[in-house]
Amino acid sequence: MKRILLAAFFISNILYSQEKIIDTVQGTKQNLDEVIVKGIRAKFSSPISYSNIYKEKLKNKNLGQDLPILLNFLPSVVTTSDAGAGIGYTGIRVRGVSPQSTNITINGIPFNDPESMGTFWVNLPDFTSSVQSLQLQRGIGTSTNGSGAFGASINILTDNISQTPYAEISSSFGSFNTRKNTIKFSTGKINDVFEFSGRFSKIDSDGYIDRAFSDLKSYFIQGTYLKGSTLIKAISFAGHEKTYQSWYGLTMDQLKENRRQNPYTYENEIDNYKPVS
């Protein structure tokens, strides 16, 4: 019995000594895309109703209308447009709650007006072209920005780094003399460290409502430094909007006569605003 046990022990040692470790990644280098982790986004296990929308889906719908209009296919979402064409002054309600109770963040930074808690999408024409992904949370969610998140939260992440250079020109045309022209570019990774990208857009529309034209311009510029585990981004974006006011309502008689009426109060009733972020 002792001889059998000794032989078995000897054989097991021999088999173990024959194992060889093979390193399949030795001498190779893998460059991975950036990953931005945001604690204010809900996960699958979170007890929150939410929808994730990615660039591919937004790109198919992005023909010049404001971002809220592109989200009107989501559950519990209702959108509004002063000019009636989805361009200019637009709004979004989630579960019927006031837009002032919908918290908007861009790269984790609150975008709501700090006084009124409103979000003026007219100041972000064609911002959809610079969005990588967004998450809409219905009801109270994971936002850290207080009362502005009672109704809903929309968390927006802007474009990722492009590994390769590109240049893109796109144009679209639609009803009510609506036109969108966009130029986008990226240098790609320079010396495997730097990347610069940008977008310039011009949108025009006569609007569905009488005289409710929109003349919109915007830009988005991004500079990135990426080395090792260090990622630094500098982002600037702004819009310039000229819109004829069309927020007054109509009586039932006016609606029956001409649904496109726009009450006249004074000459050249135009909003001309140019904020910078």
Which role fits each region the language model picked out?
Residues Q30-E34, V131-L136, A152, T158-F173, ...:
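Transmembrane beta-strand segments of Gram-negative outer membrane beta-barrel proteins
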Residues P110-R138, L157:
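Short acidic/polar hinge/loop motifs at secondary-structure boundaries
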Residues N31-G64, G91:
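N-terminal periplasmic "start-of-domain" segments of outer-membrane beta-barrel proteins
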Residues Y166, F173-D204, I209-E257, P275:
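Transmembrane beta-barrel wall of Gram-negative outer-membrane proteins
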Residues I69, R93, Q135, N155, ...:
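Outer-membrane beta-barrel architecture
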Residues T28, V77-G88, I109, E115, ...:
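Short, glycine-/polar-rich solvent-exposed loops and beta-turns at beta-strand/coil boundaries
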Residues M1-I22, L32:
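Bacterial Sec-dependent N-terminal signal peptides
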Residues P68-P110, Q132:
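Extracytoplasmic beta-strand/coil segments of soluble accessory domains associated
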